[in-house]
Amino acid sequence: HDYIQAAIERGAVAIIGEYTIDLDIPYIQLKDAKKALGYLAAAYHNFPSRYLTVIGITGTNGKTTTTHLMHSVLNAATKGKAGFISTIGADFGEKNVDTGLHVTTPTAPEIQSYLATMLEAGLTHVVLEMTSHGLDQGRLAGVDIDVALVTNVTHEHLDFHGSFQAYRDAKGLMFQM
């Protein structure tokens, strides 16, 4: 809600948010605006994950390594038709992109844009590293997962999640996609 006025000044014709506010343009109040953003981004890109085989990988440790190993195997098996999105970059087939993040899952609009680009490039499989923060914050909403893999779950990120149960629940969101 911190940027609503700036969005209106830049030409926004409608706003989606979580709190009751009075605006002169249409306002849709939702329980989880971040999750809605994921589905809106997916719709904007014509739901690219529906046309790809998406392998989601999460865990406390080993996500990035497992993502890259799985990508290598799939890329060989599909003759170059596999890509990946991880915390350190994305592979679009013929092109590698530094996501600039190196710590967590990209935003929902970025993920959907990457998936759409991969689909347009003729890829058929994508390995997607999924952090607990990204899952909890709805950044992966709108991504259809075909295969879900968990490397491990140990006591980490409790500063963000508050408890081990909440951390485990965030990881479990992957199985609802």
Task: Give each language-model segment a name.
Residues A36-M177:
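Phosphate-binding loop of NTP-binding sites
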Residues H1-Y39:
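N-terminal leader/targeting and accessory segments in enzymes
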